[in-house]
Amino acid sequence: MKNKIVELIKNSLAKLEIDGVDIHVETPKNTDNGDFSSNVAMQLTRVLRKNPRVIAEEIISNIEEDEAVEKIEIAGPGFINFFVKKSSLGSVVGKILEDDFKYGENNIGQGKKVLLEYVSANPTGTLHVGHARNAAYSDSLARIMKKSGYDLSREYYINDAGNQINNLVISAIVRYKQALGMDAEMPDDAYHGEDIKVLGQKLKDEFGESLLEREDLNEFIREYAVAYEMENIKKDLGDFGLEYDVFFSEKSLYENGLVDKALESLREQGFVYEKDGALWLETTALGTGDDKDRVLIKADGSLTYLTSDIAYHKNKLDRGFDLLLDVLGADHHGYVARLKASVVAMGYKADQLEALIMQMVQLLNNGEVVKMSKRTGKAITLRDLIDEVGADAARYFLVMRSADSHLDFDFAVAKEQSSDNPLYYVQYAHARICSILRQAAEQAEYDVKNCDYELLTDEYSVDLLKNLAYYPEIVAQAAKNYEPHRICNYLQSLASSFHKFYNNNKVITENKEQTQSYLALITAAKITLRNALDLIGVSAPGKM
């Protein structure tokens, strides 16, 4: 229906010989302002040098009559408000029943090639709650963007080079020796996690004392430990519903000479200089807002983290992606400007790299702050979250707020089986519909694809129809703005609309035509609830 309104306005402007206008049509929060509203008249004020209300009148007078539109009004400074006939709203049910799993698909991405990189935690320990939020939010965004016509690839960058891996090797060797009963002390800056103890024991069980005789012990442990940690990370992410297209190794950048090539590219572009024995990138001259230049090669010849990151982003862009979308932790806020500067320095555009910064998560239980796992006495991990509340609840609660908002996650609320739990409220709507449909099937045969939409004109049916019709636009906006939390907001609204409909209408009655129409409506609601839940990686149970 929204597309039809846009087309009506577009045709009217054509009659007025006005073109090149980006027509915006929104859904007013207040139904007194119609079902759809456009500010196109106000957009044209400067161009036409007329009062926007006068422009609005001219546009309306040139809009062709349409059987779906009841009336058009001008409001405020020049908003054009469209009121749709109640009887025409029902057509969305037929579309949903026909589209089924495809309902909500759109082409706002127009095939744009996007590389979404997310989580990318160091392979030196278990994933924590911050990684869990990044995982849930980013995976949901990937699903939404794929549904919206983007050619999207999901990538995990394995930080398997650098000093953190040297520390991992030292930590693993100490734990291995301790498992053998040897006297070995863990350095203060080593990794003290339980997973490293398990790794040490695993090395002892698999190899006994034989590894101590190897001349290449460090290199062997490096490969083994990284593989072990990545196996654990992949297991946790898989149990959380994540899939990746590519796992990219930082180490491969060095092995394939890509770091040297990136440095060569920066030198050719003329944005590097030497000072105090170090090689610097002139990020302040590249217009991305970085407040000081950055070191690439230190005076001692070692490379900074930025250097390999530059090589990695050059590799991404050289692979032909139109947009690189990095999802980073809150501690990376100041890092984005220098990354963008490096992209520009290599001859690409700054807007080919965008970053989402995920803010912190605070865990609560009945409003009380929780810092440690009762089971382990350690910081709470992604695995702890899954074990505590389940993957569905963990994902839903971690996606509910925008990336730039701090998030409070209350375990008690997530486990509650009442309307106070937003996920339970949504899933219960789906389960209730499934129950009604099973009940109807036991009583008679109904053909939901052959119903009378004219019977869906009561207040609660109309509200539900409007909510169903909004869904494709919600998906498109969530994709365009990188905001998967919009899907959670929509699910709350749709579930509320259904529950109100159910509480005020008897679905199965002796009037078969009315029953059939109501069953078609709630089947459309069921499909939409399922599709929206799937976009955030959450199940739609048939029974609860």
Language-model segments: residues:
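Non-catalytic interaction-recognition regions
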Residues: 2-90, 101-544
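Short, charged, solvent-exposed linker or helix-capping segments at domain edges/interfaces
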Residues: 91-96
